[in-house]
Amino acid sequence: MKKLLLASIIGLASTTSFASGSTTPVISSSDSEIKLEGFYLFESGFSNQNRLGEFENLSDNRKKTAFYTEAAFAATITKTINDVIGGVKIVLQPTTRSKTSTSYNGSHIFIETSYGKVELGSPYDAGNKLRITGGQVAAGSGGYLRYINVGSKYMQYEKLKPDFDTSPSFYIESFSNNFDEFNVKAEAARKISFYTPKMKGFQAGISYTPDSANTGGNKNINNVVFDDSITGITNVRTGIKRNIVENDEIITINQNVTDSISGGLTYEHALGEDADLKLSVTGEYGKPARLAVRSKVIDKTYTVLDTYKLSNLKAYNLGAVFTYGNFSCGASYGSLGKSLTTPQYHKNGRNTYYYNGAIAYGQGPIKTSLSYFKSSRYKNTVDTITVATEYKIMPGLLPYAEISHFQAKGKPVYYPEAPNKKTKGTVGLIGTKLKF
């Protein structure tokens, strides 16, 4: 009976809040509060890309059309005693792909006072939460990258794919925790974070991560299992890249880091009645977890041929957003330098950087934007231009449409003698976002 009553109260609060235009349903008493928030996205993608093979479809059986969904639901429970706020954020795993953002993901405990806020166990670091990118002012979802294939057979050389970056989030959401090996239920590594209160427009934050492979979405704490030689990997779950090169040799690169420090500083200032400026600088530093290993299976035995040292993780991002009346513009630049690379494998280049910008105009419920993104990873480049529009039917309900044209050019980093190859295409998206 108690469970039924609680469910009825939550449902009533959610319905009332959505109808009244509130984005966050709240259930509160004198010193306790339960805040509910959720998100659902449905999207149709249409892709027209050249240089794809006969069986390189967008979905299993459709070459140019696919649907995509994303969802999240979280409850933040807080209790206030003597001006000290203690609480926990609990995120539920949805039946569709989880929304991977700081607002809708990452269960953790937090304590907040007038001196600042401490987060224990959050998968998102200060560099992620305080960062600013140019794309933040854009309309739509910016999800064109879900519908392209920059590692097709045409782009490969000796069966090795080229490395590309198609989104600025690669640099900001902790470089060491954003790999293809993650399944849809995985979360980034656990962190301890501290954020100062906002003072005269300034806010700072810092996070510590002991081991980026210590994720929260996997069954075991130890997500990378090695055999007796500590280089032959018998179980791979997080951040490991194994590349087959000449003579059937394997180069294994563990892209995890230890003792990672992430930090950020933001500044917000009202320049006038209709003008605002936001600035941000964020960065991350970490030590490589292990050496890169060159190996080969000889007579059914895993044999280590050589080991290589990887460079430290050193990444930063600079961003700014300026708003004047109905106009907004944003720009950002991010760099990884030579982070987690070695000249013995990354022969074609070792540096990675990106920059992007966007301008948007909003009038009433309608918002339209134009954005540009360019990245270079090991001298492999991606250029993308996107036009998007969205219409707020009611608070929390936002249909959108966007069209992106992209071009990717490059080659596998291990083979500098390989020819540069290019693929390009156009992606159209139509979708709806629902937030409460």
Swiss-Prot record:
One of its GO terms (molecular function) is porin activity. Keywords: Signal. One of its GO terms (cellular component) is membrane. The keyword Signal applies. Coiled coil: none annotated. Pfam families: Porin_4. Residues 1-19 form the signal peptide. This is Uncharacterized protein RBE_1298. It comes from Rickettsia bellii (strain RML369-C).
